[in-house]
Amino acid sequence: MINDNVHLGHRARKRFGQNFLHDQYTIDSIVSAIAPRQNDVMVEIGPGLGALTEPVCDQIDKLHVVELDRDLAARLREHPRLKDKLIVHEADAMKFNFDELAQPGRPLRIFGNLPYNISTPLIFHLLEKSQYITDMYFMLQKEVVERLAAGPNSKDYGRLTVMTQYYCQVMPVLEVGPHAFKPAPKVNSAVVRLAPWKKRPYEALNIADLQRVCQEGFGQRRKTIRNTFRSFITAEQLEEIDINPNLRPENLTLAQFVSIANWLTTHR
């Protein structure tokens, strides 16, 4: 009997959220979208068994890979074809300083089939380094991509949406079914491109205040904002910045979230 948890001699580890990509059409589509170039500083998060690593290395001379699984990191270091091209960082991507890989005049580009159990906190970690990054291509749960790309007035719109769109343009690339992985996940997946803005459309004076407004707002998303935000701004003050206090957090645009955060920053 074939064990679907074993692929290319490696047993998928549940605690690392491992699902290995093996469908060639999907692999080719992702690498084509990434379009690696020699001058790029390319970084792969969670290379696993090398499904994306190998075709990317066909197009560039050096690739940084960040892999937490000791066995997989060892396989990559000893890979007969790739070992001279790979710089293996055996590390937790959640704690990794991606900005240290940035080089003047060379685009820092990050990609990966992210473990679904850490994808949201990892995206928040990377957003903090966004000024160093040119773009990111990630395989994620389809529902996470829908949240990243959502607009106001939808159930998918939330804190992750607002904070990601504050830092990045969000562009869904392709949808991927469970058949493309071993073991097959119980959910559909999708690839998304996150491209940090060269000049943000709206600038928060204090990012911690924007985070607070999002956290408090979406923590009580069904309440009107006159109630949700009453600890720091009144209904009258909301009207002064042209925001209807009877709206709910899920009705607010990114620009309105930034306006409320900037009001908070300047009225302490």
From Swiss-Prot:
Q: Which reaction does it catalyse?
A: adenosine(1518)/adenosine(1519) in 16S rRNA + 4 S-adenosyl-L-methionine = N(6)-dimethyladenosine(1518)/N(6)-dimethyladenosine(1519) in 16S rRNA + 4 S-adenosyl-L-homocysteine + 4 H(+)
Q: Where is the signal peptide?
A: none
What GO CC annotations are associated with the protein?
A: cytosol
Residue positions annotated to bind S-adenosyl-L-methionine are N19, L21, G46, E67, D92, N113
Output the SUPFAM superfamilies linked to this UniProt entry. S-adenosyl-L-methionine-dependent methyltransferases
Which Enzyme Commission number(s) are on file for it? 2.1.1.182
Which domain of life does the UniProt lineage start with? Bacteria
Keyword Cytoplasm among record annotations: yes
Q: Name one GO molecular function term.
A: RNA binding
Q: Which UniProt keywords apply?
A: Cytoplasm, Methyltransferase, RNA-binding, rRNA processing, S-adenosyl-L-methionine, Transferase
What Pfam families does the record point to?
A: RrnaAD
Q: Where in the cell is it found?
A: Cytoplasm
Task: Sum up the protein's function in the record's words.
Answer: Specifically dimethylates two adjacent adenosines (A1518 and A1519) in the loop of a conserved hairpin near the 3'-end of 16S rRNA in the 30S particle. May play a critical role in biogenesis of 30S subunits.
Q: Which NCBIfam families match?
A: ksgA (TIGR00755)
Family per UniProt? Belongs to the class I-like SAM-binding methyltransferase superfamily. rRNA adenine N(6)-methyltransferase family. RsmA subfamily.
Q: What HAMAP family does the record point to? A: 16SrRNA_methyltr_A (MF_00607)
Recorded protein name is Ribosomal RNA small subunit methyltransferase A
Q: Which organism is it from?
A: Tolumonas auensis (strain DSM 9187 / NBRC 110442 / TA 4)
